[in-house]
A protein has these predicted regions:
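Alpha-helix-centered segments that form part of catalytic cores
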Residues: 115-128, 254-263, 400-423
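C-terminal accessory regions
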Residues: 347-476
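N-terminal pre-Walker A segment at the start of P-loop NTPase domains
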Residues: 1-18
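Conserved helicase motor core of P-loop NTPases
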Residues: 15-19, 27, 158-170, 178-378
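ASCE P-loop NTPase helicase motor core
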Residues: 16-17, 21-240
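ASCE RecA-like P-loop NTPase motor cores
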Residues: 1-4, 38, 472
């Protein structure tokens, strides 16, 4: 460690020493590296990768979302993928499509229930080396079954279970911030909990926590204020109305009202483009309402998508490689096509992070009906339509070509998007922007709980340079 170019904090040095012991220990399987905003988790991950490479160990870098994986790859200069794409592979549909098609044709009805893709744990490639897995943004790695899934089911449905079972001999380093929001519909972040590993897996997880703000962030008032919010999260005061210590901060601008804040956001989008700023809302409904104000202010006056619109990808896309959470700008809008009771439109889009342009179909119903994805019924119609098209070409469900063509079918792989001018906090997780605007509803501070402060902490730490909020009695 003497030759490293970094000046580590005391907690970083201690964590590195513990990690070195973990790497060489034959019995240790899981290490949890916790750290709040600005404590240098990413710097430490880079150093860990360097040390592991020196030891010629097999490193597999993962993140909980596609956006987080891209950011991680860029920062560490080491290839990263999502946990899902690393450990699962497509197996088959959960039902026989031919039987469903016959029933529909014979009885003019369908009682077969939900139709979805089944993904199973993929086989680990044979190797003499022990694999070392680093999972970033691990606060979003859940272990509850997703009951709202409409298109695909993965393994046992419990991601953390499956990850550990994927490589029983592997070592796992989970990196994250326990103050960030946990996975949707879960009360804690299981991958960052020593108690969870002990109770669920009988695994004694090693743990280190970064507590000191690193030198380059100790003058950033967003980081300093976020640590005050973190303390409120750790010990929520019993009060009817929460108070947020966000006043008198150089990096936090307070507007007189929401309208002034939105006007500033619109002007910044016009001046700087879409890459540097975002607006975070409490609910999807609030996102929709604010989007209806922002689009006309930007000159996007058509009710339907047009050139210059900002979109958020809501599902990983096999054709383009675009990931759930990626933001794209519409370059052009082409012709419509209709299949499976759905409307598709050809679009050219530019991914903000890489500026790369993609050309493919997009499903309109999701964008215009305030959905984030297709319903079970819509998804089923799309699957059956694909089956019929393949059957007409003599390709059956169990054929190798059936599976292969699924990966490139333009309708199955049409983009699923929503407008991206305003994001929920969960959708923003794993991302960061120079400028972040927060829409805090008046009812938000009422009877505050740990989740109240957790949401605010997660949202405000998406901002690197400047945070914007509107005036409220809850500010102090």
């Amino acid at each position: 460690m003497e030759n490293t170019p970094f000046q580590f904090t005391l907690s970083q040095q201690r964590a590195l020493e513990q990690l070195n012991e973990f790497v060489t220990s034959a019995s240790s399987k899981v290490f949890i590296l916790k750290g709040y905003a600005g404590t240098g988790k990413t710097t430490l991950v880079r150093e860990i990768i360097r040390l592991l490479k020196e030891k010629e160990l097999s490193i597999i870098l993962m993140a909980s979302t596609g956006r987080a994986a891209k950011i991680l790859s860029n920062i560490t200069r080491h290839a990263a993928t999502t946990v899902h794409s690393a450990i699962y592979e497509y197996k088959d549909f959960n039902q026989n499509l031919e039987e469903i098609a016959k029933e529909r044709q014979k009885f003019k009805m369908d009682k077969s229930g939900q139709l979805y893709l089944q993904f199973e744990l993929s086989s680990l490639p044979e190797s003499d080396k022990q694999h070392f897995y680093i999972i970033d943004e691990a606060s979003m790695v859940g272990n509850e079954k997703d009951k709202s899934a409409t298109q695909a089911f993965f393994g046992s449905g419990q991601l953390l279970d499956d990850l550990l079972h994927y490589d029983p001999k592997g070592k796992f380093l989970f990196v994250g911030d326990i103050c960030q929001l946990p996975p949707v519909n879960e009360e804690i972040s299981p991958a960052l909990s020593e108690d969870y590993f002990r109770n669920r897996f009988d695994v004694l997880a090693k743990c280190a926590e970064l507590t000191e703000i690193v030198r380059q962030d100790d003058t950033n008032d967003i980081i300093i204020a976020s640590h005050k919010i973190r303390k409120l999260y750790a010990n929520p005061p019993k009060t009817k109305w929460g108070k947020f210590p966000l006043r008198s901060c150089r990096n936090i601008k307070i507007f007189n009202d929401q309208a002034s804040m939105l006007n500033n956001y619109v002007n910044r989008l016009k001046t700087d483009g879409y890459n540097k700023s975002t607006l975070i809302c409490r609910t999807n409904k609030s996102c929709d309402a604010i989007t209806s104000l922002i689009r006309p202010a930007l000159g996007l006056t058509q009710p339907k998508m047009q050139k210059g619109d900002l979109l958020l990808i809501t599902q990983n896309n096999l054709i383009s490689g675009l990931m759930n959470g990626d933001l794209v700008e519409v370059v052009s809008v082409g012709t419509q096509k209709f299949r499976a009771n759905l409307s598709f439109v050809h679009v050219e889009i530019k991914e903000l992070f890489t500026q790369k342009v993609y050309s493919q179909l997009m499903i309109e119903e999701i964008l215009y009906n305030n959905q984030t994805n297709l319903t079970q019924e819509q998804q089923k119609e799309l699957f059956i339509d694909y089956y019929i098209r393949m059957r007409e070409r003599g390709i059956r469900q169990k054929d190798f070509l059936f599976k292969e063509k699924m990966r490139t079918d333009i309708y199955l792989n049409a983009l699923r998007v929503v407008f991206g001018f305003a994001l929920t906090c969960h959708k923003s997780q794993g991302g960061e922007w120079e400028h972040v605007y927060l829409d805090i509803p008046r009812s938000f501070p009422l009877n505050p709980t740990k989740e109240t402060y957790q949401w605010l902490y997660t949202a405000m730490t998406r901002a690197k340079t400047q945070l914007y909020i509107s005036e409220g009695f809850w500010l102090e």
